[in-house]
């Protein structure tokens, strides 16, 4: 029995070049899934180039590293156009971890790479700590052929977690706090919709269910 991902992959292989997005909250295994796909392609002798934003230096500066400490070598890039220093005509696969930390020009770049026959695999947060769409991620997901949305486990109740809880001095962050703040388990948690808290977050709608 084939998964829907495997079926789509077989169909896409008939034509070279497409975009895959792996998204979800922190601790959902996004980097782990990206590394799994990269490792499978390495076994197939594909020519792969892996990138991550220089901003993300939590575990290593020249490797993509998951929370489980699985890793692969990567290039740090400060700007999206830096990928062209390393991607060549004979590159088969381009993988980018934590793509949400790059500038928005990465959208046009990865579309160009896919049009040029590259398989592009990216991972990133689909929402920020406020549970709002993260930067250009909605546009990226709309342009991709394959979108894999992962969930974590809520640290409070054990339900499927779709949100990233930012903790500051032991308390939930405020809505107007900076969006980008690199951290790991000491500053973020996975939470479900009902356990996720943001101080002073505007309520978009006040209903009156009866």
Walk through the language-model features, giving the residues of each.
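Walker B catalytic acidic pair
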Residues: 98, 124
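Conserved AAA+ ATPase core "coupling" helix
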Residues: 151-172
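Conserved P-loop
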Residues: 2-88, 128-139, 149-152, 173-174, ...
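Conserved catalytic/switch belt of AAA+ P-loop NTPases
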Residues: 110-115
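Short basic (Lys/Arg) and small-residue
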Residues: 144
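Conserved ATPase-coupling elements of RecA-like P-loop NTPase cores
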Residues: 99-109, 129-134
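Loop/turn-to-beta-strand initiation segments
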Residues: 91-93, 116-123
